[in-house]
Structure formats: structure tokens, C-alpha cells
Amino acid sequence: MKIIEFAYPNVPINEEQISLCLGFFDGIHLGHQTIIKKAKKEGYKVGVLTFDNSPAFVTGIINENLCLTSIADKAEYLSDMDVDFLYLMHFDKEATNITKDQFIHEVLKPLNPVKIFCGDDFTFGARGEGNAKYLSMYMPVEVVPLQKMDGVKIASRDIKKLIQTHRIQKANELLGRPYRINGLVVDGQHQGRSIDFPTANLKLDYPYVFPDFGVYMGYAEVYGKRYKAIINVGTHPTVIPLYKPIIEVHIIGFEGNIYGKDIFVEFIDYMRSEKKFDSVLELKEQLEKDREKAKNTLK
């Protein structure tokens, strides 16, 4: 997959016609995947036009810039789907002034789309005045209706809410894969090591959606190898409580120094709430139970 980064008005010119998918594509969830699959059926090479920053955040529609996927994540997932081109447009305050007609004639047309594919909620141009109906006056457009699974909307906003309320399994179903974050392992207080339960403290590489406080089972990818893991999100109230929540990962079966290394962490299921134990011994006993459950449950 070729990645083309640009900022308006320096839009790349594509010589060959392509099927072009439009949207922010946060999460590359099942709804997004449906759009891309429909585009691939046209028989042309497929491009995805998205943005380096959330238009909803830049324009003030939402207050928090929390995402399900980083730019690197999106590139990986789109490449896995055999997308040919990823057009990454810089989106800042100035970009909010691009009119709907400028977007059509000066951004889309140079990319040479034979057909546009988008969700039914896609808007573009200053104040979001452009929509699929308006766009169809200038080029062929296929609108992919909002998808649902078991009555739940497959939408980035709804998936974020699921993650923030412990419902990781349902979020993963809508994503079509486990929710994954990437972070740098940083030095911590070494409290886990003192009870033979070492953890990797993560400094997130991107403003990912933070799961609600609690203990989760999942996987950690270290040096390209996938390990079972238990993940604590919170302030570890039993041992030197923190003011700011962190993500700590106990990587089952791994021994080694990974400080300063980037690792991937996948959340598979919620196990229990975070709680303050009466003693460190009681905490250790519970952690051992958590580890055993994760080892036996995860494949």
C-alpha cells in the first residue's frame, strides 16, 4: 500500500482511476470494512482518503480527542485489507474553511475517482455543508448504510462507549478484531516486582480511548511474539495509590528488560473491578488467581 500525505491546496494528482473511500475511519471497524469491500468489488484499485486529525475534534463537535486507532494502526489494518492507496490529508483549523465545492473540485477530482464510497453520515466542507447527495451531482457515489450487530450500531462513537464501560467483548465484535493500543514501556515504582508480579507500565503513543478502571485479560506483543497477559487500568489503590491512572501489563511467561521498548497490548475481556485490598498478601493472592484464569481462558 502506498501512503501519500498532503496538505491542501497541494493535492496529489492521480493518473489512474480508482475507487475512493471517504471518512475518518477511526477503528477500521466492521462498518468501515464493509465500505472498503464494496469499493474493491468495482474492479479498480482502491484508495482511502482520511485525515491526520479528527475533524470532529478540530471543529469542536467533540471535546476529547480520543481515538480507537493511531495513524500507524489505520495504515496497518488498511494494508491488511489490500487497499492500494492511503491518502492522508492534514486537517487543522485552516482546513475547516475549505468549502464543499473546493473539496470536490480541488481535493477529490485530482485523485481521479471513478466512484466514491462513504457512510450515510459522511459530511465535508466548511460547517459540514456537503453530503453524499450533494457530491452525487458531480461524481458517482455509493452510500453504505449504517451497519448494526444485534441491534447495536457499528459506529466509532458507540464502540468507544463500550470500551469505556467494560464491554470489551462487544467492542471487539464490532471492531472485527481485539481492541489494541501501542505504548512505550517506562520505569515505574517496581511494586509489582516486589511481590513477584512484574508489570510493564505503558506510556501511550497516541490518545487512545482509555478503558474503564479494572483488570482485563488480553495479549502483549513483545519483539514480535504474542504473550498472554493481564492488564490493570487504574491507580493500584492497595500499593502507593496514584493520582493519575495508568495501564500496567503483566506479561505471562515473559522475562526480560523491555524498558524503552514499544509494545502492543490487546484487550480481550474484562475480568473484575480494581479494588483496594486489606493487605499486599491479599492482593498477591488475587493476582495469582487472575493470572491462572487468563492462562486457562486465553488460547
Regions from the language model: what does each represent?
Residues 45-47, 84-85, 114-115, 140:
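Residues at the starts of beta-strands that form the adenosine-phosphate
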Residues 5, 9-70:
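N-terminal catalytic cores of NTP/NDP-binding nucleotidyl/phosphoryl-transfer enzymes
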Residues 41, 78-79:
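ATP-dependent adenylation/nucleotidyltransferase module used to activate substrates
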Residues 29, 78, 116, 171, ...:
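Residue-level signal for inorganic ion chemistry
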Residues 188-299:
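Phosphate/ribose-recognition catalytic cores of enzymes acting on nucleotide-derived substrates
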Residues 97-199, 223, 278-282:
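Classical nucleotidyltransferase
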